[in-house]
Amino acid sequence: MAKKFFEKTKTHLNIGTIGHVDHGKTTLTAAITSYLSKINNTKAKSYSEIDSAPEEKARGITINTSHIEYETNLRHYAHIDCPGHADYIKNMITGAAQMDGAILVVSATDGPMPQTREHLLLAKQVGVPNIIVFLNKIDMVEDNELLELVELEVRELLDIYEYNGDSTSIIKGSALKALEYIEKNDLNNKWVKNLKNLIEALDKSIPEPKRDINKPFLLSIEDIFSITGRGTVVTGKIERGKVKLNDTVDILGFNLLKTTTVTGIEMFQKILNTAEAGDNVGILLRGIQKNEVRRGMVLAKPLSILTYSKFDAEVYILSSSEGGRKKPFFEGYKPQFYFYTTDVTGTIEFLRNPEKPEMILPGDKVKLRISLMYSIALEKGMRFAIREGGKTIGAGIIIDLIN
């Protein structure tokens, strides 16, 4: 069957669910699509369809970020269901880097947990501009005072990570209960109404993002597929600019640079002639083998961005109370650095100055020189996260690039 063309009639936003493992992110995503499928053309996605990777089903947790589409009366959303499990924060960073806004899911029975904090920190670091909160599983909490305490704790946590706790929309409900009643076609039930309130808050509380469509095209590659007889497809979010059929583009990163031609563009299995900043797309490339491309490379307008392996940065090292290191580190320290969809090991050098420190302590704000194992596409002002041993230990911004 021939694929349909993607018609852009509504504002497109990238949204996502973030939060601690088992707090109900995937169930909420399933409930949203099920509800919207009853009132418009959205395709319902079950929990098992969203949690679709075989390893995920076996463990009952989301590992890769799942991309789902749905429509409200006002907007078209690409929804990214992000992993909450600590082992898979790396994939969450990729998902969060693509979001215009996020739904932070917090279980009312637990309140904020370690990954709740880490997801908020990473959301801030990769530039997620707006957050709304779904306080889930309230059917399991009988004490209203306890609910109020959890809400207060969530608002305080939002303030810590520079999201305005006082003005953030917090919607209380139960994703599982809503899903049960939607499946019974009882859309006037109170649990379904709570879910409807959340969907309305999405439309109202997440502002329409300003897209950089006039800047040179840039897409950070998230995944790569081979299509027999057609070639290689790369997927990811367009960070800025536009791309159209037959455009010439550079693939660069990890010490490689190749030039190729765009021979197809798709979004949610529908064909596009042109795609622009904010779109989550698959791009078919001429004459490129799957093994030549890897996640973390970028597609870009030729010569609009260059690769570097060394840069200076302003960095904040998390304190132990923020989930960071407990001990200081010294020159030569080698953590992982995360940019868009890339993660690369790098070596830290303390910048020479009159009071050059011997060591850097958790909680310090410092300027560092970083040498990466590979050259990757970098720019001034680009933000990154620093991780070691399965946890985020710092966050930074590039202030200078070194040839």
From Swiss-Prot:
Top EC category: hydrolase
Annotated stretches, region: G2: 60-64
EC number: 3.6.5.3
Keyword Protease assigned: no
Organism domain of life: Eukaryota
GO biological process terms on file: mitochondrial translational elongation
Binding site for Mg(2+): T26
Residue sites binding GTP per the record: 19-26, 81-85, 136-139
Keyword Magnesium appears in the UniProt entry: yes
Annotated CDD domains: EF_Tu, EFTU_II, EFTU_III
Family: Belongs to the TRAFAC class translation factor GTPase superfamily. Classic translation factor GTPase family. EF-Tu/EF-1A subfamily.
Its biological purpose: GTP hydrolase that promotes the GTP-dependent binding of aminoacyl-tRNA to the A-site of ribosomes during protein biosynthesis.
Designated name of the protein: Elongation factor Tu, apicoplast
